[in-house]
Structures are given as C-alpha cells and as structure tokens.
C-alpha cells in the first residue's frame, strides 16, 4: 500500500479565499478584514456627528441650543447626551422610546448613542487594522498596542463612567465646549485633579511631549552630513545604508547635560512608547474608579482646621471650596429636571469673603 504525504490542495477557491484576496489586495488605501468594521463605523460616527451638530437641538434633553441651525459655532455645537430619564437605554431608532420616528429619536438624544457606539467600534477597527497590516508585513504589533491607550480612555469616559452613574446623561457630549463642561463637572463632583490616576495621566502625556521634543531635537542635532545640500532635507538620501544620526554623539551630549543618557536605541524608543501609553491607561483606570464614585485624596485635617480657624487656609482648602461652588452652581443648571434651588445662604463662601 502506498501512502502519499503532502498538503491537500483545493482545486478552486471558496468564498472566503475570494474575499480574502480582494480585501487584502495591495492598493492605495488598504481595506483588509478590519476595514469591514472600521470604514462603516467611522462613516456612521462622523456622519452622525456632522448631522447632529448641524441640525439637532438639545432643548429636550439639556435645555440647550447645540446646533449650527440654532446659532452655535464650531466650538459650542455638540451632539448631546440623552435625557437622564432615559437612563442606559441604547436608544435604537426602532426601540420603544422613538418607535421608528427619526425626528423624535433625534430629540431624545439617539444620535449620541449612535455616534458613541459607532465611534467606539470604529476605533477598535482602526486598532485591528494596525494589527492586520503589521502581521501582513511581518512587523511587531506595538503600534496597535500603543493605540489601545486612547481607546481605553474613550471607553472609560464615554461608556464605563456613565454606566456607573444614573445614565448616559452624565457622559460627555460630543463637542468642544461640551467636553470643557464635562471636565469642570469632573473637578467639581470628583476632585479629579487631585486623583493619583489623573496625576499619572498628566505625567504620561506631558512627559511624552517632553521626550518627543528632546528626541526630535537630538536627532536633528546629530544628523550625519551625507550630502552637500543647504539643509538637512536636501542632504537626506532615502536609500542610505548607514544610520541617519550619531547615537554616540547624542549619548556624549546628554551625558554631559544630565550626567545620564540613553545608550541603547531600543530602550530609548521603548521608553518613549511606555510613558504615554502607561499614563493614558492609568488615567482610564482612574475614570473607572470615578464610575464607582471612588474618591481622590482627602486631607481632612486641613479641612477641619480651616473650618475652625478663619486665618488658616491652604491651596487644598481653597480648591475644596471651589469644588463646592462648582457643585452648587452647576447642579441647578446642569440638571434642570431635578428643579434644584439653592438659597443664597447655602452657597459656599471662602474665608476671604
């Protein structure tokens, strides 16, 4: 008996092979399997945002004007969150709230869930696109891993935080001034700037900006002169075989400046990846904590002493008073459905007043 060993070859391509060939074909803009998720979701998210900021009011959800049609500009227009009474409803157009009525769906805030969900899956599709392309050209997947950081922040802020609160109402609306209002809300109600996870996020973002500036300047400073051009761009040869800049010179320079310097390019670039990604992930974890109403640092001894001694005040106690002011003034206008009325005598006043 004869046994033949070898790979089983298919005589003809099946549907999957045909789709794979078409999706992963070499073209100007790569599509790929990830594109089946990315492109439709990005299209609907951006389309929903442009539609909402152009035409849709927030009168029925926030008591606000939020569209170009009502007189807003690019900084003040927004796609606003649904009303608090709708809690965590996904607000499908065909759901029990809108019942297929597109106008009513827009009035209830359906565009916000539409933009948020399609935006989230669009970002995930973009990360998968980086995985797919990296695998195709045999690269490591660190670009996709790095992009997980802004995705983590987006998911924590726009989904996990409002899921921990009473509804989508407390998520940020999609607009510039709307995001600023949300930041003030986070400070007043959660003392976010004194949260250690926020501190790590700030250190990550600002540290990454510093590293980026230092690295770019150092490379420009230590470029090899491989041409006779008047500037570094004309002198650059895209097919050069040697390295572009002198790591040895850069190392000697920073060793003299700081006393320490990176001596290994791999460690240097990993550090530039690690700092911002870790910072953003820590910030995302902090927002998850806020969803559960975990508190930031409380320096109670300073608050007690400030309450007892009119002459004692720290920057911390001043900030606590500012937070109380934000809560008292903001809650009434930010949550009109609660009909909150604060008498003048209960509004916070600092020691200086």
Curated annotation (Swiss-Prot):
Disulfide bonds: none annotated. The keyword DNA damage does not apply. The D1/D2 heterodimer binds P680, chlorophylls that are the primary electron donor of PSII, and subsequent electron acceptors. It shares a non-heme iron and each subunit binds pheophytin, quinone, additional chlorophylls, carotenoids and lipids. There is also a Cl(-1) ion associated with D1 and D2, which is required for oxygen evolution. The PSII complex binds additional chlorophylls, carotenoids and specific lipids. GO terms for biological process: photosynthetic electron transport in photosystem II. A plastoquinone binds at residues 215, 262. PROSITE patterns: REACTION_CENTER (PS00244). 2 of the reaction center chlorophylls (ChlD1 and ChlD2) are entirely coordinated by water. Belongs to the reaction center PufL/M/PsbA/D family. This is Photosystem II D2 protein. It comes from Cuscuta reflexa (Southern Asian dodder).
